[in-house]
Amino acid sequence: MAEKFTQHTGLVVPLDAANVDTDAIIPKQFLQKVTRTGFGAHLFNDWRFLDDQGQQPNPEFVLNFPEFKGASILLTRENFGCGSSREHAPWALTDYGFKVVIAPSFADIFYGNSFNNQLLPVTLSDAQVDEMFALVKANPGITFEVDLEAEVVKAGDKTYAFSIDAFRRHCMINGLDSIGLTLQHEDAIAAYENKQPAFMN
């Protein structure tokens, strides 16, 4: 079972860049591991750090600003997660501490991989995202409330509606990954297997 996602209130960090690809999210030299942990240290490595090893923070990159330390909601621009289809990208984002990414659009494969890893991709219009960027710029350190059950984001005095496929929404709210979904049908699977001839078991 994965962690359940119903509502989340978190600090918002604005990454004002379009077409952020998966190589920018987690560079290829850090992909050797097959477990989901440890990638957060290298999230946006080429932007966050001045050196390849990730030892010297870049003071001009937004994730390194003190007011955004501990951010769990990433606000960004269109076509986020484009490029190669590495699942390490949502792994790096969640390992860093992000629960939600808000953007006008996402690359299809990244979008699907996000749900598989309990990272909620929220799609809003360009105009709505523009409003949010202005709000965060005027109020650095602001928090947004994301309610998956009601499918709304509360930002300042405004509420923004979004839509998530019913099946994906159900899985996130109930903390169901592919294993969890299979276990929901464990009794039916066992009953089916018991009906098979002995040589098939």
UniProtKB/Swiss-Prot annotation:
Catalysed reaction equations from the record: (2R,3S)-3-isopropylmalate = (2S)-2-isopropylmalate
Known EC number: 4.2.1.33
SUPFAM superfamilies: LeuD/IlvD-like
Keywords: Amino-acid biosynthesis, Branched-chain amino acid biosynthesis, Leucine biosynthesis, Lyase
Pathway: Amino-acid biosynthesis; L-leucine biosynthesis; L-leucine from 3-methyl-2-oxobutanoate: step 2/4
Gene3D superfamilies: Aconitase, domain 4
GO BP terms: L-leucine biosynthetic process
Superkingdom per UniProt: Bacteria
Pfam families: Aconitase_C
EC main group: lyase
Annotated GO MF terms: 3-isopropylmalate dehydratase activity
GO terms for cellular component: 3-isopropylmalate dehydratase complex
HAMAP family for this protein: LeuD_type1
Family from the record: Belongs to the LeuD family. LeuD type 1 subfamily.
Subunit record text: Heterodimer of LeuC and LeuD.
Role, per record: Catalyzes the isomerization between 2-isopropylmalate and 3-isopropylmalate, via the formation of 2-isopropylmaleate.
Name this polypeptide is given: 3-isopropylmalate dehydratase small subunit
